[in-house]
Amino acid sequence: MNELLIKAEQLQQAAKTLALLSTEEKNEALTRIAEALIKQKEWILQENEKDVALGKEQGLSPALIDRLQLTNERIEQIVDGVRQVADLPDPIGEIVEEWTRPNGLRIQTIRVPLGVIGMVYEARPNVTVDAASLCLKTGNAVLLRGSSSALHSNKALVHVMKEALRDSAIPADAIQLLEDTSREAAQQMFRLNGYLDVLIPRGGAGLIRSVIENATVPVLETGVGNCHIFIDESAQKQMAIDIVLNAKLQRPSVCNAVETVLIHQNWPYISELVETLHARGVELRGDSQLASSYSFIQQAAETDWSTEYLAPILAVKLVQNVKEAVDHINRYGTKHSEAIISEQNDNVRFFFQAIDAAVLYHNASTRFTDGEQFGYGAEIGISTQKLHARGPMGLRAITTTKSLVYGTGQIRS
């Protein structure tokens, strides 16, 4: 039996124990994990630096290096996420519905764990801890498969978490890392029916497509983020500039960063916006009108409208009205996060009704599409599909339900 099957068997057994634990037992284990991560922070950073150095040698893009790199601040954010998950209400056992039939049968629908979750992700070590904490809180065991570029970091994080669990009620086997990062091992993982209850891919378009096309295990799809902001004719100048700068520059390498800004052609502050972006080092790719009006704006190609740059690059386009903006977003968007900056309620209402996306914003940055920002604690991913879960996926997104039927001897006639 190879490494993967051994770990899958261990996960199955651990999931059975996890499903029976109390909220207090799970929270105590999460607190131990948070404390251990802080205690082992320097070692984790040393292991992460090995990955970062190797990534630079191999020519990883600045965006990927940024996602890969851990810092003191980022580890503290990860630990805060674990503690927040411990503080959140436990959805397991929650009564979703309850009713009594005319024949006296009392029926309850309650939340239960999914079982064993397989996480497939790229160079994001924070996902290792985020996924583990959310899974443990909801009584799920988790098989983690990160990228080879983050292997030192992931091994360190999983080691610290497993050691922290050894003195808790949660079996250490409830967290497993697939250290074989080969394509063959990944393909085997995608077909672990009977061991894994669901796969959750979290990463770029290529990774997600690979999982969807090759998996026989059910997939809970997360999506890439070609996010848009539409600046309406009535948008306040400083609000619009501040939101666009935040959505593009606060952290360009993440999926909720804005990639295209659509501007109403009659908005009076177009020059101020594009000149501010240019001064802040953003490479602008615009439609023919903008490219001919500003020497620092490159002519956009058709592919620019559908590109998730994950870098300080922004596509910009003038539109005649909110309908043209909506049509553009529905054509090129990835159903992730879309925003309108406007003081016209009718336009906001139309934007919200007409756009097919997981999260829509009025007068706010797209950067808020995040489990922690939504109050979920850490997130397992951001779903852009419509079945089971959509948007930032917190605790409830990785549960399912079962029905409990209480009778007094009823038989069906």
Swiss-Prot record:
It is found in: Cytoplasm. Catalyzes the NADPH-dependent reduction of L-glutamate 5-phosphate into L-glutamate 5-semialdehyde and phosphate. The product spontaneously undergoes cyclization to form 1-pyrroline-5-carboxylate. Pfam families: Aldedh. Pathway: Amino-acid biosynthesis; L-proline biosynthesis; L-glutamate 5-semialdehyde from L-glutamate: step 2/2. Keywords: Amino-acid biosynthesis, Cytoplasm, NADP, Oxidoreductase, Proline biosynthesis. One of its GO terms (biological process) is L-proline biosynthetic process. CDD domains: ALDH_F18-19_ProA-GPR (cd07079). This is Gamma-glutamyl phosphate reductase. Its EC number is 1.2.1.41. The gene is proA. Signal peptide: none annotated. Belongs to the gamma-glutamyl phosphate reductase family. Gene3D superfamilies: Aldehyde Dehydrogenase, Chain A, domain 1, Aldehyde Dehydrogenase, Chain A, domain 2. It catalyses: L-glutamate 5-semialdehyde + phosphate + NADP(+) = L-glutamyl 5-phosphate + NADPH + H(+). GO terms for cellular component: cytoplasm. One of its GO terms (molecular function) is glutamate-5-semialdehyde dehydrogenase activity. InterPro entries: Ald_DH/histidinol_DH, Ald_DH_C, Ald_DH_N, Aldehyde_DH_dom, G-glutamylP_reductase_CS, Glu-5-SA_DH, GPR_dom. Its main location: cytoplasm.
